[in-house]
Amino acid sequence: MSQWDKRVAVALILGLSLPVLSTTSSVATLRLSQISAVDALSSLPVKGRAAKTGFSRDQFGPAWSDVDHNGCDTRNDILKRDLVDLLLKERTDNCVVLTGTLIDKYSGEEIAFTRGVSSSMEVQIDHVVALSNAWVTGAYKLSDLQRKALANDPLNLFAVKGRLNSQKSDGDAATWLPPLKSFRCAYVAQQVAVKKKYKLWVTAPEKAAIAKILSSCPKQQLPTK
């Protein structure tokens, strides 16, 4: 077993984040992606919800911070990742999305996005693990920097149909699932990946709901981004 293999094994057992090595990052990503969502779910602690006392959006830092320091806020980063046929605003260093088309993961619908006071709401950025849910399942114990990272992590963000994002609110898998059934396996795997990465727990009903979905796709892999 190589030194890297040993480090991977120890990190996975302890639930630690793996270091990013420029020459081996693709190998590390490959190995992590081979973790099944079922196995990852079984590793998550099961507890009741903590009190919501103290929760506010401000606890997760300024909305859509430029945490990766690429000169573009997180919202526009995700719009650029998830939309096609983009038109970007001039003199914004290819940051601000003016128009684009979303193939919505939650419904399968094609949705036109136009930047504007009201029209922007047609496409919203969903926290796959809602921040309120994260708070009551362990995020209240994270540092300010960790919560800011969670709120802006591409792993925890999808551009989606605005109405469905509002419908979901802060629901977990026990209370809300995407109407597009073919996406549900990937959706709950994404939630498991986020909770594992940030050492959050699941409630018993939440775990049961996720396990039920994954029973139809036992080979579903844990996403890494």
Regions found by a protein language model. Give the residues of each.
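N-terminal module-boundary/linker segments of secreted carbohydrate-active enzymes
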Residues: 26-72, 204-206, 219-225
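A general boundary/transition motif marking the beginning of the first structured unit of a protein
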Residues: 29, 90, 179-182
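Secreted/periplasmic proteins that engage bacterial cell-wall peptidoglycan
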Residues: 51-123, 128-129
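Domain-level detector of nuclease and nuclease-like folds
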Residues: 97, 106-225
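Secretory targeting and sorting signals
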Residues: 2-26
